[in-house]
Amino acid sequence: MKALLMTVAAAGSLMLAGQAGAVDAKAAEALAQKNGCLACHGVANKVVGPGYKDVAAKYKGDKTAEAKLIAKVKAGGSGVWGPIPMPANSPHVKDEDIKTIVQWILTL
């Protein structure tokens, strides 16, 4: 009985730990809208830049994806998804907003 109780407690702790780092999808999408990201990116489809689901698929399993994408969003870049460059978004988009948006994209 004690072992069962310990197992249930450990499972509950893991579930809560997973939720602590979870991104609020609605809030993140609202940040993307507010900061103009959705003018060039769709969630499920390409607009000017790639759709966010395509970005998530490309970086699935890449443990360095978050850092790479944050750097790309801040500095801008070209040649990865087509000929149209993405403009730099720093400093006019807050670092914490960029991080939240990137974390959300990677959950799609």
Predicted feature residues:
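Short hydrophobic/aromatic patches at helix-to-coil boundaries
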Residues: 104-108
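The canonical Cys-X-X-Cys-His
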Residues: 36-43, 101
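Bacterial N-terminal signal peptides
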Residues: 7-15
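Axial heme c-ligation environment in periplasmic c-type cytochrome domains
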Residues: 48-59, 72-102
